[in-house]
């Protein structure tokens, strides 16, 4: 799985077992993180009671390779703490949460903690004291970033996979979205108490972002809509129709205040990305409008786009081409491929991942399978009537 995001001035790109921290302005690599093939060599402890021999077998061994197990370590999520002092990442294969101390040249590993299940999203607390990890069964755990030996704390649970998680700046609410169309606002630390729901989406909610300076958030969904909510009341403030289902969302604040650029990645559409400028009506605290919108082709169809990062002038798009990681840059202004970024530099970056295959995620499984029981019943009833009529005709003859 590939992940990319922009935390000024760094562009962070993670894939396979590597994370690169890039400066897109001077085309330098700040630092990198490379995980070992077997995380037990850096402190991962196998959970007590684990009975699967393959889980205990070192990933780098010949036996594991020959068996073709799915225990190859690969990075799933990467996140910077708000104070920029910590880096957290989660892995698949050997499921773990790794916490690093961010330093100018090298990141120092602080802890490696086993995860019970594969992670789906990751978010730091606003004060950087802890990190939230959600898994594919819908559970959300809190891991302490100060007391590194403290056990994880189960905070809340969904009945389906959680795709994104936010922690409000005042740390009073944790906001989650899932495959079952829901956006849930949970009180913190009393997470047994649900404050509100933001309901209205008809398909999975793939991404959330807080609109700074307000009590509002924006969401993107597989139902082809972009929506703005008051998360305290659960009231919908804006609904904008998209040309295709949205599977990724990024947000960037603009000047003047309370103007934001929202970017979404579309699923299986001729245009890969959509850019939308959100503006709050000066006469009202609840009225949002789409002031500007633009579609970016990004050569959709010629390669498999998996994620992107949004900067002031550019869109960095990562994906797979012939099972190799590919990175391309487009202008935010016109959607054309950027000519200011040397192709050689992009090739140099992706060459660092040359030993890692890049297989795109199958996003079709995000959509819920719907069954029309009435149609099936009517079809069976029709066949019974036809069979009965045939039997009557045979008896008469």
From Swiss-Prot:
- Please tell me in which tissues this protein is expressed: In testis, it is present at high level in hub cells, a niche for germline stem cells of testis. Ubiquitously expressed in all testicular cells throughout spermatogenesis. Ubiquitously expressed in all germline and somatic cells of the ovary.
The record's section on InterPro entries has: Trm82, WD40/YVTN_repeat-like_dom_sf, WD40_repeat_dom_sf, WD40_rpt
Query: What residue range is the signal peptide?
Result: none
Question: Has the keyword Nucleotide-binding been applied to this entry?
Answer: no
Cystines in this chain: none
Can you quote a single GO CC term? Answer: cytosol
**Which GO BP terms sit in this record?**
oogenesis; spermatogenesis; tRNA (guanine-N7)-methylation
Going by the UniProt record, its keywords in alphabetical order are: Cytoplasm, Developmental protein, Differentiation, Nucleus, Oogenesis, Repeat, Spermatogenesis, tRNA processing, WD repeat
Q: In which pathway does it act?
A: tRNA modification; N(7)-methylguanine-tRNA biosynthesis
Its subcellular locations are: Nucleus; Cytoplasm
- WD repeats located where? 70-110, 114-153, 157-196, 200-239, 300-340
Q: What is its main location?
A: nucleus
Q: What does this protein do?
A: Required for the Mettl1-dependent formation of N(7)-methylguanine at position 46 (m7G46) in tRNA. In the Mettl1-wuho methyltransferase complex, it is required to stabilize and induce conformational changes of the catalytic subunit. Required for binding of nanos mRNA and repression of translation by the mei-P26-bgcn-bam-sxl complex. May cooperate with mei-P26 and nanos to derepress the BMP signaling pathway. May cooperate with mei-P26 to suppress expression of a subset of microRNAs. May cooperate with mei-P26 to regulate bam expression levels in germline cells during gametogenesis.
Q: Which PANTHER family match?
A: TRNA (GUANINE-N(7)-)-METHYLTRANSFERASE NON-CATALYTIC SUBUNIT WDR4, WD40 REPEAT PROTEIN 4
Q: Which family does it belong to?
A: Belongs to the WD repeat TRM82 family.
What else does the entry mention about this protein?
A: Wuho means 'no progeny' in Chinese.
Quaternary structure, from the entry: Forms a heterodimer with the catalytic subunit Mettl1. Interacts with mei-P26 and weakly interacts with bgcn; required for the function or formation of the mei-P26-bgcn-bam-sxl complex. Interacts with nanos; may be involved in mei-P26-dependent derepression of the BMP signaling pathway. Interacts with Myc; the interaction may be mediated by mei-P26 and may be involved in the regulation of ribosome biogenesis.
> What protein name applies here?
tRNA (guanine-N(7)-)-methyltransferase non-catalytic subunit wuho
Query: Origin organism of this chain?
Result: Drosophila virilis (Fruit fly)
Lineage, please?
Eukaryota, Metazoa, Ecdysozoa, Arthropoda, Hexapoda
């Amino acid at each position: 799985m590939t992940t990319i995001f922009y935390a000024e001035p760094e562009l962070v790109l993670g894939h396979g077992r590597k994370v690169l921290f890039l400066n897109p302005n001077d085309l330098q690599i700040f630092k990198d993180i490379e995980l070992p093939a077997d995380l037990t060599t850096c402190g991962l402890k196998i959970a007590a009671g684990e009975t699967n021999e393959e889980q205990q077998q070192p990933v780098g061994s010949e036996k594991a390779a020959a068996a073709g197990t799915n225990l190859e370590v690969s990075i799933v999520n990467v996140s910077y703490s708000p104070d920029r002092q910590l880096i957290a990442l989660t892995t698949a294969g050997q499921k773990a949460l790794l916490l690093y101390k961010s330093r100018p040249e090298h990141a120092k590993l602080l802890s490696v903690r086993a995860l019970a299940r594969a992670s789906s999203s990751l978010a730091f607390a606003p004060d950087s004291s802890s990190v939230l990890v959600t898994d594919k069964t819908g559970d959300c755990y809190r891991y302490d970033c100060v007391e590194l030996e403290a056990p994880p704390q189960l905070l809340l649970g969904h009945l389906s996979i959680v795709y994104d998680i936010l922690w409000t700046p005042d740390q009073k609410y944790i906001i989650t979205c899932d495959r079952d169309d829901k956006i849930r606002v949970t009180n913190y630390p009393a997470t047994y108490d649900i404050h509100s729901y933001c309901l209205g989406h008809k398909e999975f909610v793939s991404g959330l972002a807080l609109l700074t300076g307000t009590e509002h958030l924006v969401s993107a969904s597989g139902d082809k809509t972009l929506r703005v909510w008051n998360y305290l009341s659960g009231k919908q403030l804006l609904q904008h129709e998209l040309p295709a289902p949205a599977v990724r969302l990024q947000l960037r604040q603009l000047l003047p205040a309370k103007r934001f650029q929202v970017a979404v990645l579309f699923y299986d559409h001729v245009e890969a990305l959509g850019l939308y400028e959100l503006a709050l009506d000066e006469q009202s605290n609840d009225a949002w409008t789409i002031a500007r919108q633009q579609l970016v082709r990004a050569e959709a169809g010629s390669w498999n786009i998996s994620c992107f990062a949004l900067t002031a002038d550019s869109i960095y798009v990562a994906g797979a081409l012939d099972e190799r990681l590919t990175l391309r840059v487009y202008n935010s202004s016109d959607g054309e491929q950027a000519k200011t970024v040397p192709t050689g530099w992009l090739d140099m970056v992706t060459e660092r991942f040359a030993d890692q295959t890049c297989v795109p995620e199958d996003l079709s499984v995000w959509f819920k399978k719907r069954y029309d029981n009435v149609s099936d019943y009517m079809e069976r009833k029709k066949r019974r009537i036809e069979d009965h009529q045939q039997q009557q005709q045979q008896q008469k003859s």
